[in-house]
Amino acid sequence: MNKSTPANALKGAALALAVSTVLTACGGTDSSSDAKAEATPSATPATEVRDPLVATFDGGLYILDGESLKLTRTIELPGFNRVNPAGDEDHVIVSTDTGFRVLDATAQTFTAIEYEGAKPGHVVRHAGRTVLFTDGTGEVNVFDPADLGKGKKPQGRTYTSAEAHHGVAIELAGGELLSTLGTEEKRTGALVLDENNEEIARNENCPGVHGEAAARDEAVAVGCEDGILIYQDGEFTKIDAPDDYGRIGNQSGSDASPILLGDYKTDPEAELERPTRVSLIDTEKKKLRLVDLGVSYSFRSLARGPEGEALVLGTDGAIHVIDENSGRVERKIPAVGSWREPLDWQQPRPTLFVRDATAYVSDPSEKALHAIDLETGEKTTSVTLPESTNELSGVVAGH
């Protein structure tokens, strides 16, 4: 475990308690195709939808009622599109060919708000702010999601990376902005800026930096090809992987726990590694534990339960519920049939999205979507859709 103390390090009391962070995990560096993204609604929505979910399919978006799973709206949108919670009760961020667009999922229509830029990448929600990272330009946009309801682009903070790269950024409760460092060819670590975008900390001991998550007490982590890098209370700490190459590229955090859930890959030469182990990173003890599930999973398989429990959708079709403190698999909740991760990261595969105590799991092979009660393990609702879905998300208020 290695520490680096930043110049002008923050003194005094620890940072404010963290609130939950939702990670946008990804399996590659491109976030859209070359098709022009023009949204065409299939019909005029009659009423607002409750707790909407948004799923992508080849050619558009499905909007579903979060309680009944009724398909309430189909929006035609060419290209490879991605979806993430915007941070309020109504909106979802849609990554398209032209940039980030804001969908009013409750009203079932796109707003006029767009953050244009090539290769829109990670979307991060934390401490009352939503942060967008545009890979093609290195631009970071920060805004209060509560302002999205005003119908125009929120006033917010902007920062442009020294060089464009596949990156991620997060604004902390005290106004510090952590953003990754790199180029299109090489990513090396992260820096931290104060409220005036002046650098106050830096660590370049994180090769291949990718992904982000926050744990309790605002311990913010980014993944490396040889472990994980944590920023907390004004300083960086590196937790080394047990293998020379131990990549933790996707992570999921919870404000209910100091322990992060991550993937874990050990073969740098693999065209597609299908790992069976996940990582549990204790941000308090600065330790890393590996848990072997016995089955593989994908970057769309990681989530957290309402009490901080680690959830992994395995290729056996079950949600593996892991006690994040002991590393023990407590139970397996049947969700879908067995599946295999496709070589192309943009191709559909079963996806896990968790909101409160409900797990939503898509099954592209059956064109199905299921809602599962995490407490009872029972499927409460299922629906068959016209087309196979790819990404799955929904509105999530708060952080």
Q: Which positions does each model-derived feature cover?
A:
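Bacterial signal peptide processing site
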Residues: G27-D30
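Repeated scaffold domains used in trafficking and secretory/extracellular systems
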Residues: E38-A46, L77-D90, E114-R129, Y159-G174, ...
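Short beta-strand elements that form the blades of beta-propeller/WD-repeat-like
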Residues: E48-F57, L61, N84-R101, V123-V142, ...
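A short beta-strand motif characteristic of beta-propeller blades
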Residues: E67-E76, T106-Y115, G149-S161, N197-E204, ...
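Acidic, serine/threonine- and glycine-rich low-complexity intrinsically disordered segments
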Residues: E184-G305
